[in-house]
Structures are given as structure tokens and as C-alpha cells.
From Swiss-Prot:
Phosphoserine found at: 75
PANTHER family xref list: CXXC MOTIF CONTAINING ZINC BINDING PROTEIN
Record note on quaternary structure: Monomer.
InterPro entries: CXXC_Zn-binding_euk
GO molecular function: zinc ion binding
UniProt effect for mutating residue 36 to A: Disrupts protein folding and solubility
Annotated protein name in UniProt: CXXC motif containing zinc binding protein
Annotated binding of Zn(2+), by residue: 33, 36, 67, 70
Domain-level remarks: The N-terminal and the C-terminal half of the protein have a very similar 3D-structure, suggesting they arose from duplication. Requires a bound zinc ion for normal folding and solubility.
Family: Belongs to the UPF0587 family.
Name of the gene this protein is made from: CZIB
Domain of life: Eukaryota
């Protein structure tokens, strides 16, 4: 199956360097079995800090899962070196923020939640624990004396 990139697109207001924080950041995904096409009905999360051994000593992955329909064992790995911030210059354009090594599991949907951080463009003010579940986030930058926000968060998956 190979590598699949998650691309983010958003409208940033006086904000830059939007990024997931820490190895415990939860990437909430819905997965599709590459063998039979079964799509999970529940959100599942994968984290950098999780490592599960693959059968037969073939390494490890962020998640290993047996398909409920065809019983095939599939896996997905977060490629830590590919995690990139979404910056002010990326505003309203799709940008790859992470890549996944997919072995039988294909992500088909993404639900951003809590755990993002960003900074004020002019002031550098740090904003932590940004929750994007509602696809919008607003706050006020005291240093710059201006409102800040992240709006219209959308995503797409592309094969690398």
C-alpha cells in the first residue's frame, strides 16, 4: 500500500506554526482494510509513543489490527520525521503535516481534536492545547492586542 500523506488546509488569522504536540498526540482516523475494503465505523487513534510488534518479527508499527471481516492482520506506522507544522504562508492551501506507512490499512477520514499548539505571527505568543474538533478555534493575543484564530479546517489524504 505504501505511504499516505495527511494534508491539512485551514484559514489562519494572525497564527503560525500550527502543529501536533508530543509523542502522545492522538491522530484520530477511520481506517479501510486494503484487502476487503471494510471501513471502521469508529474513530481509532494512533500515537508515536505506541509501538506494536508485527507477527513473525517483521518489525513494529503504531497500530496492528485484525480486520473484523476478512481477519487479515494489517498495520499502520506514523513516520515521525514527516511531521511538519502548518504555517501562515500555507494559509488556505493543502500542506502535508504527516505521512503514514500503510501495510493493509488505509486512512480514509481524520478528526482533529485537542493537542495542537501554535504561535502568534507578530508576537510569538504561544498557544497550547488547541482543540480543532469543531474545525474552528479562536483566542486573543494579549501581546499583539489582536484576535487569533484557525478556521475552516479540512483535510485530504494523498498517496506519496
Amino acid at each position: 500500500m505504501g505511504k499516505i500523506a495527511l494534508q491539512l488546509k485551514a484559514t489562519l488569522e494572525n497564527i503560525t506554526n500550527l502543529r501536533p504536540v508530543g509523542e502522545d498526540f492522538r491522530w484520530y482516523l477511520k481506517m479501510k482494510c486494503g484487502n476487503c475494503g471494510e471501513i471502521s465505523d469508529k474513530w481509532q487513534y494512533i500515537r508515536l509513543m505506541d509501538s506494536v510488534a508485527l507477527k513473525g518479527g517483521r518489525g513494529s508499527a503504531s497500530m496492528v489490527q485484525k480486520c473484523k471481516l476478512c481477519a487479515r492482520e494489517n498495520s499502520i506506522e506514523i513516520l515521525s520525521s514527516t511531521i511538519k507544522p502548518y504555517n501562515a504562508e500555507d494559509n488556505e492551501n493543502f500542506k502535508t503535516i504527516v505521512e503514514f506507512e500503510c501495510r493493509g490499512l488505509e486512512p480514509v477520514d481524520f478528526q482533529p481534536q485537542a493537542g495542537f499548539a501554535a504561535e502568534g505571527v507578530e508576537s510569538g505568543t504561544a498557544f497550547s492545547d488547541i482543540n480543532l474538533q469543531e474545525k474552528d478555534w479562536t483566542d486573543y493575543d494579549e501581546k499583539a492586542q489582536e484576535s487569533v484564530g484557525i478556521y475552516e479546517v479540512t483535510h485530504q489524504f494523498v498517496k506519496c
